[in-house]
């Protein structure tokens, strides 16, 4: 019998490494919406704890969350509007967000498109008074004139060009005369859509006129003071305490002992 290693013998296995739950190394942060909206508690997000050169705040800044206007303003009729919010600052365990865009849900857009009518779209780059460069998309549909017998409501190319020009003028006027906060306040009740519908009555009657999308192309440099103004100017509840300044006490040397 040959003496040597028996390959059939099972090799003793070492102790298995204990699985660690990755969530034990993460912290949860609250997401706060600006004061444009009624319900400011958007939700929560998590991030790895600060460790070494990796700071948790740096990982959170720049995150983009999406919320329905039905949840933000507690109005189910506005569920087709989606608002994007970007995390621009951290205060304690709270993420302070700012407006980053608006869009319609796909089912709402599909419900607007129908036969026998013309769809008119326009987009315009505008700048607010506080330095935000926005791209605003407007959509509209033609409707029947009073006492019209004809089935379709197709607009001529000249009508479409004239309506689109009115859209450009109104969007430019409404955006250039206000800051971002006031512009968002105009988006929610559809002020721009009503202005376009009123201004184009003499060209061709319109219906379902909406600002369907807004993109933030360029934002000014981050400023914590301006961000706090958007959030009401006060410190967010739950933030870390700033601390108390230590008293300036001078050191006094103790008197020497007579004997030890």
Swiss-Prot record:
Major subcellular site: cytoplasm
Record keyword Ribosomal protein present: yes
N-acetylalanine found at: 2
GO MF assignments: structural constituent of ribosome
This protein's UniProt keywords: Acetylation, Cytoplasm, Ribonucleoprotein, Ribosomal protein
GO biological process per UniProt: translation
One Gene Ontology cellular component: cytosol
InterPro entries assigned: Ribosomal_eS1, Ribosomal_eS1_CS, Ribosomal_eS1_euk
Pfam family membership, one: Ribosomal_S3Ae
Cellular localisation: Cytoplasm
PANTHER family assigned to the protein according to its UniProt record, in alphabetical order: 40S RIBOSOMAL PROTEIN S3A
Family affiliation: Belongs to the eukaryotic ribosomal protein eS1 family.
Assembly and binders: Component of the small ribosomal subunit. Mature ribosomes consist of a small (40S) and a large (60S) subunit. The 40S subunit contains about 33 different proteins and 1 molecule of RNA (18S). The 60S subunit contains about 49 different proteins and 3 molecules of RNA (25S, 5.8S and 5S).
Official protein name in the record: Small ribosomal subunit protein eS1
Lineage: Eukaryota, Fungi, Dikarya, Basidiomycota, Ustilaginomycotina
């Amino acid at each position: 019998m040959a003496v040597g290693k028996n390959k059939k013998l099972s090799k003793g296995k070492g102790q298995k490494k204990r699985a660690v739950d990755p969530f034990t190394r993460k912290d949860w942060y609250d997401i706060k919406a600006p004061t444009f909206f009624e319900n400011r508690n958007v939700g929560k997000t998590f991030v790895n704890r600060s460790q070494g050169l990796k700071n948790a705040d740096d990982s959170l800044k720049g995150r983009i969350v999406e919320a329905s206007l039905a949840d933000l303003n507690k109005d189910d009729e506005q569920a087709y509007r989606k608002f994007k919010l970007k995390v621009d600052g951290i205060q304690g365990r709270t993420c302070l967000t700012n407006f980053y865009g608006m869009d319609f849900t796909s089912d709402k857009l599909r419900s607007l498109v129908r036969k026998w009518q013309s769809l008119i779209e326009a987009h315009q780059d505008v700048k607010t008074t506080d330095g935000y460069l926005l791209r605003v998309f407007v959509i509209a549909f033609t409707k029947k004139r009073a006492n019209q017998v004809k089935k379709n409501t197709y607009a001529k190319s000249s009508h479409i060009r004239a309506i689109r020009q009115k859209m450009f003028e109104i969007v430019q006027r409404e955006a250039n005369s206000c800051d971002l906060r006031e512009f968002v306040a105009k988006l929610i009740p559809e002020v721009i859509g009503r202005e376009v519908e009123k201004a184009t009555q003499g060209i061709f009657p319109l219906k379902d006129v909406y600002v369907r999308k807004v993109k933030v192309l360029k934002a000014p440099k981050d400023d914590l003071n301006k961000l706090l103004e958007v959030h009401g100017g006060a410190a967010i509840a739950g933030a870390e305490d700033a601390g108390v300044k230590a008293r300036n006490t001078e050191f006094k040397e103790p008197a020497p002992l007579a004997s030890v």
